Amino acid sequence: WIQRHNELTALTAAGVSRTRVITPIVAAAIAISLSTCLGRELIIPQLAKKLDRDPKNLGGEAGQELKPRFDNETGILMQGVYTFANEQRIQQPSFVLPETLDQYGKQLGAESAYYRPPEGDRPGGYLFKKVLRPSQLTEKPSLKLDGRAVVMTPHDAPWLQSDECFVISNINFDQLTGGRSWRQFSSTAQLIAGLSNPSLGLAGEYGADVRVAIHARVVQPLLDLTLLFLGLPLVLSGANRNVFVAIGLCGIVCTAFMMVVLGCQYLGEISLLEPALAAWAPLMIFVPVAVGLFDRIEY
Protein backbone atom coordinates (compact mmCIF):
# COMPACT_ATOMS: atom_id res chain seq x y z
CA TRP A 1 0.00 0.00 0.00
CA ILE A 2 2.81 2.44 0.81
CA GLN A 3 4.41 1.47 -2.50
CA ARG A 4 1.23 2.12 -4.49
CA HIS A 5 0.76 5.58 -2.99
CA ASN A 6 4.44 6.51 -3.33
CA GLU A 7 4.88 6.77 0.43
CA LEU A 8 7.97 4.59 0.18
CA THR A 9 9.48 7.05 -2.30
CA ALA A 10 8.97 9.90 0.16
CA LEU A 11 10.54 7.91 2.97
CA THR A 12 13.61 6.97 0.94
CA ALA A 13 13.93 10.57 -0.28
CA ALA A 14 14.06 11.66 3.36
CA GLY A 15 17.02 9.35 3.89
CA VAL A 16 15.12 6.48 5.50
CA SER A 17 16.41 3.17 4.16
CA ARG A 18 14.02 0.43 3.14
CA THR A 19 15.63 -1.81 5.71
CA ARG A 20 14.61 0.65 8.40
CA VAL A 21 11.09 0.82 6.96
CA ILE A 22 10.57 -2.93 7.28
CA THR A 23 12.14 -3.19 10.75
CA PRO A 24 8.79 -2.68 12.59
CA ILE A 25 7.20 -5.30 10.33
CA VAL A 26 9.93 -7.81 11.10
CA ALA A 27 9.74 -7.04 14.83
CA ALA A 28 5.96 -7.53 14.81
CA ALA A 29 6.34 -10.82 12.93
CA ILE A 30 8.88 -12.07 15.47
CA ALA A 31 6.61 -11.09 18.36
CA ILE A 32 3.62 -12.86 16.79
CA SER A 33 5.65 -15.99 16.05
CA LEU A 34 7.03 -16.16 19.60
CA SER A 35 3.60 -15.57 21.14
CA THR A 36 2.26 -18.41 19.00
CA CYS A 37 5.00 -20.70 20.33
CA LEU A 38 4.23 -19.72 23.91
CA GLY A 39 0.53 -20.38 23.38
CA ARG A 40 1.23 -23.78 21.86
CA GLU A 41 3.63 -24.83 24.61
CA LEU A 42 1.96 -23.33 27.68
CA ILE A 43 -1.72 -22.62 27.05
CA ILE A 44 -2.98 -25.25 24.60
CA PRO A 45 -1.70 -28.24 26.66
CA GLN A 46 -3.69 -26.93 29.63
CA LEU A 47 -6.86 -26.86 27.48
CA ALA A 48 -6.13 -30.09 25.59
CA LYS A 49 -8.94 -32.10 27.18
CA LYS A 50 -11.58 -29.49 26.34
CA LEU A 51 -10.23 -28.89 22.83
CA ASP A 52 -10.34 -32.60 22.08
CA ARG A 53 -13.97 -33.03 23.09
CA ASP A 54 -17.03 -32.81 20.91
CA PRO A 55 -18.67 -29.36 21.14
CA LYS A 56 -21.87 -31.13 22.18
CA ASN A 57 -20.05 -32.95 24.99
CA LEU A 58 -17.75 -30.39 26.58
CA GLY A 59 -18.44 -31.79 30.05
CA GLY A 60 -17.44 -35.30 29.03
CA GLU A 61 -20.64 -36.86 30.40
CA ALA A 62 -21.64 -38.54 27.13
CA GLY A 63 -19.96 -41.78 26.16
CA GLN A 64 -17.49 -41.84 23.29
CA GLU A 65 -16.69 -44.96 21.29
CA LEU A 66 -13.32 -46.42 22.24
CA LYS A 67 -11.00 -47.44 19.43
CA PRO A 68 -8.74 -50.38 20.37
CA ARG A 69 -5.26 -49.39 21.48
CA PHE A 70 -2.23 -51.65 21.81
CA ASP A 71 0.10 -51.36 24.78
CA ASN A 72 3.46 -52.12 23.22
CA GLU A 73 5.19 -52.63 26.56
CA THR A 74 2.88 -55.31 27.97
CA GLY A 75 1.34 -56.62 24.75
CA ILE A 76 -2.23 -55.99 25.98
CA LEU A 77 -4.88 -54.92 23.46
CA MET A 78 -7.04 -52.34 25.24
CA GLN A 79 -10.69 -52.41 24.17
CA GLY A 80 -14.04 -51.30 25.52
CA VAL A 81 -17.49 -50.07 24.53
CA TYR A 82 -17.53 -46.39 25.57
CA THR A 83 -15.33 -43.97 27.48
CA PHE A 84 -16.48 -41.17 29.77
CA ALA A 85 -13.98 -38.33 30.03
CA ASN A 86 -15.49 -36.73 33.14
CA GLU A 87 -14.79 -39.91 35.15
CA GLN A 88 -11.89 -41.23 33.06
CA ARG A 89 -13.92 -44.42 32.86
CA ILE A 90 -14.18 -47.24 30.33
CA GLN A 91 -17.56 -48.91 30.11
CA GLN A 92 -17.38 -52.71 29.75
CA PRO A 93 -13.62 -52.92 29.20
CA SER A 94 -12.40 -56.03 27.42
CA PHE A 95 -8.62 -56.21 27.39
CA VAL A 96 -7.06 -59.00 25.31
CA LEU A 97 -4.07 -60.51 27.10
CA PRO A 98 -0.98 -61.80 25.26
CA GLU A 99 0.23 -65.39 25.57
CA THR A 100 2.65 -64.37 28.30
CA LEU A 101 -0.26 -63.24 30.51
CA ASP A 102 -3.14 -65.57 29.54
CA GLN A 103 -2.62 -68.23 32.23
CA TYR A 104 -6.15 -67.61 33.56
CA GLY A 105 -7.83 -66.66 30.29
CA LYS A 106 -7.38 -64.65 27.13
CA GLN A 107 -9.74 -61.79 27.95
CA LEU A 108 -9.95 -59.52 30.96
CA GLY A 109 -13.43 -58.03 31.29
CA ALA A 110 -15.37 -56.03 33.86
CA GLU A 111 -18.32 -53.69 34.16
CA SER A 112 -16.10 -50.60 34.36
CA ALA A 113 -12.46 -49.57 34.46
CA TYR A 114 -11.14 -46.27 35.81
CA TYR A 115 -7.79 -44.74 34.96
CA ARG A 116 -5.64 -44.02 37.99
CA PRO A 117 -2.43 -41.95 37.60
CA PRO A 118 0.75 -43.01 39.41
CA GLU A 119 0.58 -42.37 43.14
CA GLY A 120 3.36 -43.14 45.59
CA ASP A 121 4.75 -46.62 44.94
CA ARG A 122 1.77 -47.61 42.82
CA PRO A 123 2.23 -47.18 39.04
CA GLY A 124 -0.43 -45.77 36.77
CA GLY A 125 -3.02 -47.98 35.14
CA TYR A 126 -6.67 -49.03 35.00
CA LEU A 127 -8.72 -50.13 37.99
CA PHE A 128 -11.22 -52.82 36.93
CA LYS A 129 -14.36 -52.96 39.06
CA LYS A 130 -16.77 -55.91 39.17
CA VAL A 131 -14.47 -58.20 37.22
CA LEU A 132 -16.37 -60.63 34.98
CA ARG A 133 -13.60 -62.47 33.12
CA PRO A 134 -11.56 -64.57 33.79
CA SER A 135 -13.65 -66.29 36.41
CA GLN A 136 -12.25 -66.27 39.95
CA LEU A 137 -9.36 -64.04 38.82
CA THR A 138 -9.55 -62.05 42.04
CA GLU A 139 -8.69 -65.17 44.04
CA LYS A 140 -5.53 -65.91 42.07
CA PRO A 141 -2.01 -64.46 42.19
CA SER A 142 -1.14 -61.42 40.11
CA LEU A 143 -0.03 -61.91 36.51
CA LYS A 144 3.59 -60.95 35.93
CA LEU A 145 5.74 -60.21 32.90
CA ASP A 146 9.50 -60.62 33.31
CA GLY A 147 9.05 -60.67 37.07
CA ARG A 148 7.04 -57.44 37.14
CA ALA A 149 3.34 -57.39 38.01
CA VAL A 150 1.10 -56.30 35.12
CA VAL A 151 -2.35 -57.48 36.25
CA MET A 152 -2.60 -57.04 40.01
CA THR A 153 -5.22 -58.95 42.00
CA PRO A 154 -6.46 -58.73 45.62
CA HIS A 155 -4.38 -61.82 46.32
CA ASP A 156 -1.20 -59.69 46.22
CA ALA A 157 -2.62 -56.15 46.56
CA PRO A 158 -4.59 -55.67 49.79
CA TRP A 159 -5.75 -52.21 48.67
CA LEU A 160 -7.95 -53.84 46.00
CA GLN A 161 -11.52 -54.88 46.75
CA SER A 162 -12.56 -58.51 46.32
CA ASP A 163 -14.11 -57.86 42.89
CA GLU A 164 -11.35 -55.61 41.54
CA CYS A 165 -8.07 -55.91 39.69
CA PHE A 166 -5.55 -53.38 38.44
CA VAL A 167 -3.90 -53.36 35.01
CA ILE A 168 -0.61 -51.46 34.99
CA SER A 169 -0.08 -49.35 31.87
CA ASN A 170 1.92 -46.30 30.85
CA ILE A 171 -0.84 -45.27 28.44
CA ASN A 172 -2.87 -42.63 30.22
CA PHE A 173 -6.54 -41.95 29.58
CA ASP A 174 -5.94 -39.06 27.16
CA GLN A 175 -3.53 -41.14 25.09
CA LEU A 176 -5.97 -44.05 25.10
CA THR A 177 -8.96 -42.03 23.92
CA GLY A 178 -7.33 -39.21 21.98
CA GLY A 179 -5.65 -41.15 19.19
CA ARG A 180 -3.47 -38.75 17.21
CA SER A 181 -5.07 -35.64 18.70
CA TRP A 182 -2.99 -35.89 21.89
CA ARG A 183 0.05 -35.19 19.73
CA GLN A 184 -1.59 -32.10 18.29
CA PHE A 185 -2.45 -30.60 21.67
CA SER A 186 0.61 -31.78 23.64
CA SER A 187 3.58 -29.57 24.39
CA THR A 188 6.97 -30.34 22.87
CA ALA A 189 8.17 -31.65 26.24
CA GLN A 190 5.21 -34.05 26.36
CA LEU A 191 5.95 -35.27 22.84
CA ILE A 192 9.57 -35.93 23.77
CA ALA A 193 8.41 -37.83 26.85
CA GLY A 194 6.07 -39.85 24.64
CA LEU A 195 9.00 -41.00 22.51
CA SER A 196 10.57 -42.62 25.58
CA ASN A 197 7.29 -44.26 26.66
CA PRO A 198 7.57 -47.94 25.65
CA SER A 199 3.80 -48.44 25.89
CA LEU A 200 3.15 -46.01 23.04
CA GLY A 201 5.51 -47.86 20.72
CA LEU A 202 7.00 -44.72 19.19
CA ALA A 203 10.55 -46.07 19.01
CA GLY A 204 12.11 -46.43 15.57
CA GLU A 205 10.15 -45.68 12.44
CA TYR A 206 6.80 -45.92 14.24
CA GLY A 207 7.49 -42.59 15.94
CA ALA A 208 8.70 -40.81 12.81
CA ASP A 209 5.64 -38.55 12.70
CA VAL A 210 6.20 -37.46 16.31
CA ARG A 211 9.88 -36.77 15.65
CA VAL A 212 8.95 -34.71 12.61
CA ALA A 213 6.43 -32.77 14.69
CA ILE A 214 9.06 -32.00 17.35
CA HIS A 215 11.58 -30.72 14.82
CA ALA A 216 8.86 -28.80 12.97
CA ARG A 217 7.91 -26.96 16.16
CA VAL A 218 11.51 -25.94 16.74
CA VAL A 219 11.95 -24.67 13.20
CA GLN A 220 8.52 -23.01 12.84
CA PRO A 221 9.60 -19.47 13.96
CA LEU A 222 12.42 -19.56 11.40
CA LEU A 223 9.99 -20.69 8.71
CA ASP A 224 7.69 -17.79 9.57
CA LEU A 225 10.51 -15.27 9.14
CA THR A 226 11.68 -16.92 5.94
CA LEU A 227 8.22 -16.63 4.43
CA LEU A 228 8.09 -12.98 5.47
CA PHE A 229 11.38 -12.22 3.72
CA LEU A 230 10.16 -14.06 0.63
CA GLY A 231 7.08 -11.84 0.46
CA LEU A 232 8.50 -8.43 1.38
CA PRO A 233 10.58 -7.99 -1.81
CA LEU A 234 7.48 -8.67 -3.90
CA VAL A 235 5.66 -5.85 -2.15
CA LEU A 236 8.44 -3.29 -1.70
CA SER A 237 10.28 -3.63 -4.99
CA GLY A 238 9.56 -0.94 -7.54
CA ALA A 239 8.38 -3.43 -10.14
CA ASN A 240 4.83 -3.87 -8.76
CA ARG A 241 2.78 -0.82 -7.93
CA ASN A 242 -0.49 -2.70 -8.40
CA VAL A 243 -1.51 -3.99 -4.99
CA PHE A 244 -3.57 -6.82 -6.47
CA VAL A 245 -0.62 -8.10 -8.49
CA ALA A 246 1.51 -8.03 -5.34
CA ILE A 247 -1.19 -9.92 -3.42
CA GLY A 248 -1.38 -12.51 -6.19
CA LEU A 249 2.38 -13.01 -6.22
CA CYS A 250 2.45 -13.35 -2.44
CA GLY A 251 -0.34 -15.92 -2.66
CA ILE A 252 1.63 -17.96 -5.17
CA VAL A 253 4.78 -17.78 -3.02
CA CYS A 254 2.84 -18.82 0.11
CA THR A 255 1.24 -21.74 -1.72
CA ALA A 256 4.56 -22.99 -3.05
CA PHE A 257 6.18 -22.52 0.35
CA MET A 258 3.50 -24.47 2.21
CA MET A 259 3.49 -27.25 -0.38
CA VAL A 260 7.23 -27.74 0.08
CA VAL A 261 6.95 -27.62 3.90
CA LEU A 262 4.04 -30.07 4.06
CA GLY A 263 5.58 -32.30 1.39
CA CYS A 264 8.87 -32.59 3.28
CA GLN A 265 7.05 -33.30 6.54
CA TYR A 266 4.98 -36.02 4.86
CA LEU A 267 8.12 -37.66 3.48
CA GLY A 268 9.53 -37.59 7.00
CA GLU A 269 6.39 -39.12 8.50
CA ILE A 270 6.56 -42.08 6.12
CA SER A 271 10.31 -42.46 6.82
CA LEU A 272 11.52 -41.54 3.33
CA LEU A 273 13.42 -38.65 4.90
CA GLU A 274 15.07 -38.41 8.29
CA PRO A 275 12.76 -36.49 10.68
CA ALA A 276 15.32 -33.72 11.24
CA LEU A 277 15.95 -33.31 7.51
CA ALA A 278 12.22 -33.31 6.76
CA ALA A 279 11.70 -30.35 9.11
CA TRP A 280 14.82 -28.38 8.18
CA ALA A 281 14.86 -29.01 4.41
CA PRO A 282 12.43 -26.13 3.61
CA LEU A 283 14.84 -23.72 5.31
CA MET A 284 17.73 -25.08 3.26
CA ILE A 285 15.68 -24.48 0.12
CA PHE A 286 14.12 -21.10 0.80
CA VAL A 287 16.65 -19.21 2.96
CA PRO A 288 19.09 -18.71 0.04
CA VAL A 289 16.17 -17.54 -2.11
CA ALA A 290 15.02 -15.12 0.60
CA VAL A 291 18.55 -13.72 0.98
CA GLY A 292 18.79 -13.18 -2.77
CA LEU A 293 15.42 -11.44 -2.92
CA PHE A 294 16.25 -9.27 0.09
CA ASP A 295 19.04 -7.64 -1.94
CA ARG A 296 16.30 -6.13 -4.10
CA ILE A 297 15.00 -3.98 -1.25
CA GLU A 298 18.21 -3.26 0.64
CA TYR A 299 19.05 0.07 -0.90
Could you tell me what each predicted segment is?
Residues 1-9, 14:
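Transmembrane helix boundary and interhelical loop/hinge segments in multi-pass membrane proteins
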Residues 4, 43, 230-231, 260-263:
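Hydrophobic/aromatic residues in alpha-helical transmembrane segments
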Residues 12-17, 271:
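Short helix-to-coil transition segments within interhelical loops
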Residues 27-146:
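Non-transmembrane, extracytosolic/lumenal segments of membrane-associated proteins
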Residues 33, 253-262:
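Aromatic-anchored segments of alpha-helical transmembrane domains
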Residues 49-69, 115-252, 268-273, 298-299:
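Non-cytosolic (extracellular/periplasmic/ER-lumenal) segments of integral membrane proteins
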Residues 276-289:
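Small-residue-rich transmembrane alpha-helices that serve as helix-helix interface/gating elements
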Residues 287-299:
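A juxtamembrane structural motif centered on a specific transmembrane helix
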